[in-house]
From Swiss-Prot:
Functional note: Binds double-stranded DNA tightly but without sequence specificity. Involved in DNA compaction.
Lineage, uppermost ranks: Archaea, Thermoproteota, Thermoprotei, Thermoproteales, Thermoproteaceae
Xref: SUPFAM superfamilies: AlbA-like
GO molecular function: double-stranded DNA binding; RNA binding
A biological-process GO annotation: chromosome condensation
Name of this protein: DNA/RNA-binding protein Alba
Organism: Pyrobaculum aerophilum (strain ATCC 51768 / DSM 7523 / JCM 9630 / CIP 104966 / NBRC 100827 / IM2)
Amino acid sequence: MATEQTILVGKKPTTNYVIATVMAFNAGVKKVVLKARGAAISKAVSTAVMVRDRFLPGKVQIKDIKLLSDKVQGQGGRERTVAAIEVVLEMA
C-alpha cells in the first residue's frame, strides 16, 4: 500500500480531481500531493479546499503548500517560466 500519491491537476473538471483525491484517501493513502502549473493552480487550490471542507471534514488537513516556478519550452523554442504549486494533504 502506497503511503503517498501525487495527482497532477490539469484541464479536467475540478470534481474529477476531488473524486480522485477522496478515492486515494479511502484506499488507505495517508498523503496526497496535488501538483498544478499555470492556469490550473486555482483548480488545485479549489480541489484541496473542497476535499478538506466538504468531502472529508475533520479527517484531512492541508499540511504544506509550496509555490514553485517551472521552466517550459514555449512556442518558437523559447524557454518560459511558469508558476506552479504543490498542495500536500494528509489524513488528520
